[in-house]
């Protein structure tokens, strides 16, 4: 019949002898994540078997996919594939003819970990009568000898023995059972985490302690009334002990205290040593830095050869402008009527409903040249602006977006007759209130929006120009002397690209980009006036990932060399030896090291310095290429080490947190003192009268047991 053993442990949550002594080596962990990405779980391939008695599986049609009917019934009900909780798998899933799939070792490992995650809460699940039988993924697997591959062509050269396979129905039912249990644990898990964070239950280094009875009193005083820990204190005590080796309960029957944590392996990786940060932390940080560099694509952003615009482009990001403050010669996508044109002229336009609107144009009026804009969303916010004049109050007035088309360039307009066609594409009514300052009226937040798509304008005439204006409009004529503003661009204009693959360079749409040529090619003004999808902004976004990776990996200070700054130093050392014009200055290695370090630090602080002409070192494309490639090499050749300063700083910081934690726990024990040995632990009228909720004196006693 086999042997059976029973383990029974009796604990008292509110009694003596329990231990609360968190340490870095017993950090609390559960199973916060699993590696279940499709690329890791699939494809394991599918099983194939030979058709009939074919002598060669290379013959056409010699292999076919295996189904559940190809598995002997003895294999399905074999006790080797059963947990013993049910007589056979047929009691759980229907035995129907289904195709089989091969299960990878990675999938088996992670589903097993999912089962372990549930068992952290076994006592609570039993109390709820949920998942009374522990799931076991291996029970649903059958091991067969077969050809393995995604296709028959691949499988014919890949015969394997003892291959784990499963049917889709069984796989779905297994995952559903896991999900059902996790659903039942949602509030329970939250309440457990609340209990573990209400007071410090972990310490980054060393060890701290507090009387367990004081800890229990604090939890009893502060936990929400609907906390499941109040209703199930026994089950909570066991669940916490499994997660945290610093929480230990005394076996009342045996008089012993045992560490029941099941996370010793993870806890050791999370704990720092006497001179280094935790191994897990160093691994994660290096992984993050490498991921950032990979996302930046150093080969692309340092390329001296043309790169197609869709490849170089990044997901579009909105950009904000005040059109009135941009220089026309820098923002080449803007046009302006010369200020010397002193005679305002009025025009009348319609909207899509046929309503007539009046507006004025004058010297200084600005428009967006839509011929130089990719599909774009415009949102104009006049919030906080005044626009009030002696005879012009913006409150109740309307502002609109107007699209013009004309064969005459906008900067040459002097009369309404020069305009081909125009229409109001959107408008909003303003709300404004008097400002605290005299003669000003502050406009509330507005959202005047327009989505520009070239297809809407039916651009068939290459000589036709298209412009977008934002200005006041009215159903009646606007007297030029009353409203003297040239437009309403003195506001916050947010431009958001509607397409991801188009790139512009200084206002011109391009099909390809030479990334290295962007280095040092912009002035601060032209960069500020560049469109959201400008190649310079794409470069800065990618370069920012390089800067962030350096910051994660590098703890060198100003003027200190590091593996990430010396690529610049190497380039500087060679460039000063090259034949050039003017006086040649030879700097020793100490000076070159400082120059390279300062350039790297400036880049980390503001990655846009590589684009602007003001940067003395990294505005040279050769130095930029050296940095981008050098950082990748530096990270790839790094082991699980940490910077000297980082290690010292983290350890000293951890010690300060340890001291703070112990100080907090000392306050807990002072304000929630444990009863003296000669005093009753519970049930005493004097003690219970001060408690928020009166407890059953036996509520903290639990007998846990299982039979195997």
From Swiss-Prot:
Residues 675-708 are annotated as: Disordered. The C-terminal region, phi, determines both targeting to intracellular membranes and induction of apoptosis. GO terms for biological process: symbiont entry into host cell via permeabilization of host membrane. The record marks 42-43 as: Cleavage. One of its GO terms (cellular component) is host cell plasma membrane. The lineage of its organism: Viruses, Riboviria, Orthornavirae, Duplornaviricota, Resentoviricetes. Cleaved during the endosomal proteolytic disassembly of the outer capsid. Mu-1 is proteolytically cleaved into mu-1N and mu-1C during the maturation step to generate the ISVP. Cleavage of mu-1 to mu-1C is dependent on myristoylation and binding to sigma-3 protein. Mu-1C is further cleaved into delta (59 kDa), and phi (13 kDa) segments during entry into the host cell cytoplasm. Mu-1 and mu-1N are N-terminally myristoylated. This acylation is essential for the membrane fusion activity. Changing residue 2 to A: Complete loss of myristoylation and binding to sigma-3 protein. Keywords: Apoptosis, Capsid protein, Glycoprotein, Host cell membrane, Host endoplasmic reticulum, Host membrane, Host mitochondrion, Lipoprotein, Membrane, Myristate, Outer capsid protein, Viral penetration into host cytoplasm, Viral penetration via permeabilization of host membrane, Virion, Virus entry into host cell. A lipid is attached at residue 2 (N-myristoyl glycine). This is Outer capsid protein mu-1. The keyword Secreted does not apply. Belongs to the orthoreovirus mu-1 protein family. It comes from the Viruses. The keyword Membrane applies.
